[in-house]
């Protein structure tokens, strides 16, 4: 059973940090992470919509998570959003997140096309299997998961 205590309190989404030329800024990411820690948050949700995950490359997403973990590991709860538009990259991000020691990985269903619940379940199960020692959180967004309300 998961230790749900680590998910209590304030766990804001981490905004993406860019340099003045529009490239992902590792230094600004580290500084923002430290700022949140100094403010007393209980954790961070890294790489979701606020982190502009859809617009970043897989390697940029890895670098951002590495920067966050360098500053925050062992200090606050880290949840890494790993959803991509293809299962292989999502699984790669899941394994990478686990290798860094995040507390949990999370994902919305694939976006763009509405998939049947069994296809979404397979997508999530594949990601969870890629990080078997890390807790998996289904990111429930009404826009992306309303079709999962059935009991199929």
Predicted feature locations:
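Single conserved hydrophobic/aromatic residue that forms the stacking wall/gate
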Residues: 143-152
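Active-site beta->alpha loop and helix N-cap motifs at the rims of alpha/beta catalytic domains
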Residues: 2-12, 17-142
């Amino acid at each position: 059973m998961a230790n749900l205590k680590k998910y209590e309190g304030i766990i804001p989404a981490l905004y993406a940090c860019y340099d003045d030329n529009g490239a992902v800024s590792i230094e600004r990411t580290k500084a923002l992470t430290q700022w949140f820690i100094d403010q007393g948050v209980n954790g961070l949700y890294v790489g979701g919509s606020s982190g502009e995950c859809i617009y970043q490359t897989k390697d940029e997403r890895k670098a951002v998570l590495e920067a966050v973990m360098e500053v925050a590991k062992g200090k606050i709860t880290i949840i890494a959003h790993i959803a991509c538009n293809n299962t292989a990259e999502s699984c790669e991000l899941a394994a990478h997140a686990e290798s860094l020691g995040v507390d949990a990985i999370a994902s919305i269903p694939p976006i763009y096309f509405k998939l049947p619940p069994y296809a979404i379940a397979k997508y999530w199960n594949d990601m969870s299997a890629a990080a078997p020692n890390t807790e998996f959180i289904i990111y429930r967004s009404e826009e992306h998961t309303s079709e999962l309300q059935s009991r199929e």
